[in-house]
Amino acid sequence: MNKELQPKVIFLMGPTASGKTALALELAEKHNCEIISVDSALIYRGMDIGSAKPSADELARGPHRLIDIRDPRESYSAADFRADAIAEIELIVSMGKTPVLVGGTMMYFKALLEGLSPLPSADEAIRAEIQAEADEKGWEALHDQLREIDPVSAERIHPNDPQRLSRALEVYRISGKSMTELTQTKSAPLPYEVVQFAIAPRERKVLHDLIAQRFAIMLKQGFLEEVTELKARGDLHLDLPSMRCVGYRQCWQYLDGEFDYDTMVEKAVAATRQLAKRQLTWLRSWPELNWLESGAEGNLVTLMRQCR
């Protein structure tokens, strides 16, 4: 189908604390749009404060799809997101509305836009088997195994990166094919006309200050109490993707007595700034992107003009 005849989908991307949610809510209220969250932290139930999840009032103004869909103990892959997001997009389009995908998890946006390689789902038994081998022989020995079966991935993955190394070995043991071989085939790209926007402050210092201010507000709202409740469950740990989210790890370590309160704040803010830096690095190389300045008047008008 000709792109101009396809239904429109809006991507609203940006670093953390850049004002994406506020602009998305304006879109939902003033135009015929529905919001889909593209955020790997917002998917988790019980992780509200530290993930800057939209408030009850904000959700009443503009409901967000794909938030609170997983327990923090559960995994959620880019492939899971792509399948869920496509289903939500199809539903919104069938209602005669425009989907607005809002967030900062660039890997999810990329998977949705370009498709994914047909990699097998995680297998906990094989993953445990690989971990046991690593405990016995060391990750260097497993990296040697990877070099034999998939030299391209071995060149790309460092021996001190156990998560990616384990995944590459897991893929081979499940499928009998290397990750390099499988990634040469991708699923079909998104069958819609996608109009893409990024929002960020013009000055880096402004973003850094916003991040520090927002973390201070999170602490006043009870972020430490939220992490205390998560720890008290007894089934969560710092190796889970949910607990690796910025802020959560540092609060957890503080509660474990690894460092004092001021150090926790410093580390959490620094980690969030690093996340924002990575997000901006992705966006600077993103093709066909329309840039908006955080807090600028007329962003909504500019966005809608570009979407015509």
Curated annotation (Swiss-Prot):
Record bears the keyword Protease: no
PANTHER family reported in the protein's UniProt record: TRNA DIMETHYLALLYLTRANSFERASE
Organism the protein comes from: Shewanella baltica (strain OS223)
GO biological process, one term: tRNA modification
A Gene Ontology molecular function term of the record: ATP binding
Transmembrane segments: none
Sites where the protein binds substrate: T16, A17, S18, G19, K20, T21
Presence of keyword Transferase: yes
Binding site for ATP: G14, P15, T16, A17, S18, G19, K20, T21
Cofactor(s) for this UniProt protein: Mg(2+)
Keywords: ATP-binding, Magnesium, Nucleotide-binding, Transferase, tRNA processing
Record family assignment: Belongs to the IPP transferase family.
HAMAP family, per the entry: IPP_trans (MF_00185)
Family annotation (InterPro entries): Dimethylallyltransferase, IPT, P-loop_NTPase
Assembly behavior: Monomer.
Region (Interaction with substrate tRNA), start-end ranges: 39-42, 163-167, 244-249
EC number: 2.5.1.75
NCBIfam families per UniProt: miaA
Enzyme class: transferase
Name the record gives this protein: tRNA dimethylallyltransferase
UniProt site positions, description: Interaction with substrate tRNA: T105, R127
Recorded superkingdom: Bacteria
Catalytic activity: adenosine(37) in tRNA + dimethylallyl diphosphate = N(6)-dimethylallyladenosine(37) in tRNA + diphosphate
Its biological purpose: Catalyzes the transfer of a dimethylallyl group onto the adenine at position 37 in tRNAs that read codons beginning with uridine, leading to the formation of N6-(dimethylallyl)adenosine (i(6)A).
